[in-house]
């Protein structure tokens, strides 16, 4: 396929997904579909709605805005409560969807969105923290910091503090990134480990460093996008902190790029084990890299030379995994459904574990990031 054909196909693909989805039955949320349970407020839908709102902003096509508003209005009540969401669950994943409320509030001015923003902020006010001050990833994972959590919570936190709290929490957000760099970055590769246990008690944690054993691609992807999204919401008056995160972002992209597959432009599920039996070129993390770099270049955080790395990742993913079915429907493959640490399934962070999780098609953890990268590609045209 030519690049123009890929971009046209992706536009059709997103339209197909939203035409066949609602808040009660999002076809892109494969975990929900497989569970058979009613839908809940969750980060997976949040990622997809972020992509839809970005498409609205880039294209001006109101169908993306209408869909996003209808989707979120199913959850958000007039008093600002959010159907199925409990702040006291203390799960950072549930904060992700909150970013979209700022956009809807700016467009519509409906106070229910402002109240819902405060509902989500209430979670972060009492979210348990490590002794150094980082949010626990979830209440059920005490003393643990996961890379994923930076994307889930920090952009919302930075935007709230900048807009509504006189920037009081902005330095706190910055310090959480610096703690992650201190504890979770591998000096040899420049990559970041998926998880860190401050207590060093979990079976997956190194007894000395507290880190999990491997570099999971999607966690790195979330982390790269988190830095870009936080910078976008951060006031440049915070001179040292703003430049600190920007330098961290640039160094991370440089280090990650060394692991980009030369032939396809993609990245491996476990990043530093290319070609190992069971490992595979994975869609979601590659798309997150493409999005983070393209957006970072557009906003001036990253040098323009890096855009070529992102375009190679973007088109490489589409060439390998985007296809048309005989019935005309489109399909995006190569998406790791889920990966975590600990829990009832005894997830130990080993290579065998990361290779064992299901690989699926059309899940928003891949479609959402690719949709976001697609909006950046359109913006470059």
Give residue spans per PLM region.
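Oxyanion-binding "anion nests"
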Residues: 224-274, 278
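Long, well-ordered core segments of solenoidal/helical folds
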Residues: 7-26, 66-83, 115-134, 167-196, ...
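Acidic/His metal-coordination segments adjacent to aromatic residues that form catalytic metal sites
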Residues: 76-83, 129, 134-139, 199-213, ...
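Inter-helical turn/loop segments and adjacent helix faces that build the functional surface
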Residues: 59, 108, 160-171, 230-243, ...
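Acidic/serine-rich, low-complexity amphipathic helices located in mid- to C-terminal regulatory regions
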Residues: 148-163
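CBM-like carbohydrate-recognition segments
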Residues: 2-44, 61-65, 74-92, 96-98, ...
């Amino acid at each position: 396929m030519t690049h123009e054909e890929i971009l046209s196909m992706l536009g059709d693909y997103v339209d197909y997904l939203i035409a066949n989805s609602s808040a009660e039955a999002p076809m892109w949320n494969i975990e929900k579909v497989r569970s058979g349970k009613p839908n809940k407020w969750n980060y997976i839908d949040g990622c997809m709605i972020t992509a839809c709102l970005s498409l609205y902003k880039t294209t001006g096509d109101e169908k993306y805005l209408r869909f996003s508003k209808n989707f979120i209005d199913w959850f958000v009540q007039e008093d600002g409560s959010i159907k199925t969401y409990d702040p006291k669950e203390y799960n950072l994943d549930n904060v992700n969807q909150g970013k979209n409320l700022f956009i809807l509030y700016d467009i519509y001015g409906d106070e229910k969105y402002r109240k819902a923003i405060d509902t989500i902020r209430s979670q972060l006010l009492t979210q348990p923290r490590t002794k150094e001050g980082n949010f626990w990833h979830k209440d059920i994972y005490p003393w643990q910091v996961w890379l994923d959590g930076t994307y889930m919570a920090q952009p919302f936190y930075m935007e709230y503090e900048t807009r509504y709290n006189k920037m009081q929490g902005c330095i706190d957000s910055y310090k959480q990134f610096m703690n992650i760099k201190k504890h979770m970055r591998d000096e040899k590769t420049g990559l970041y480990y998926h998880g860190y246990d401050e207590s060093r008690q979990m079976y997956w944690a190194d007894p000395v460093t507290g880190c999990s054993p491997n570099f999971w691609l999607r966690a790195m992807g979330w982390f790269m996008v988190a830095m870009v999204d936080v910078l976008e919401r951060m006031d440049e008056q915070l001179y040292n902190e703003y430049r600190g995160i920007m330098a961290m972002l640039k160094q991370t992209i440089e280090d990650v790029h060394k692991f980009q597959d030369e032939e396809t432009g993609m990245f491996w599920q476990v990043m530093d084990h290319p070609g190992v039996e069971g490992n595979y070129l994975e869609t979601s993390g590659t798309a997150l890299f493409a999005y983070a770099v393209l957006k970072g270049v557009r906003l001036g955080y990253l040098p323009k030379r890096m855009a070529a790395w992102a375009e190679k990742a973007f088109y490489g993913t589409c060439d390998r995994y985007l296809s048309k079915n005989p019935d005309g429907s489109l399909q995006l493959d190569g998406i790791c459904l889920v990966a975590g640490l600990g829990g009832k399934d005894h997830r130990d962070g080993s290579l065998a574990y990361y290779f064992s999780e299901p690989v699926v098609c059309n899940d928003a953890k891949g479609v959402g990031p690719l949709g976001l990268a697609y909006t950046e590609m359109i913006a470059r045209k």
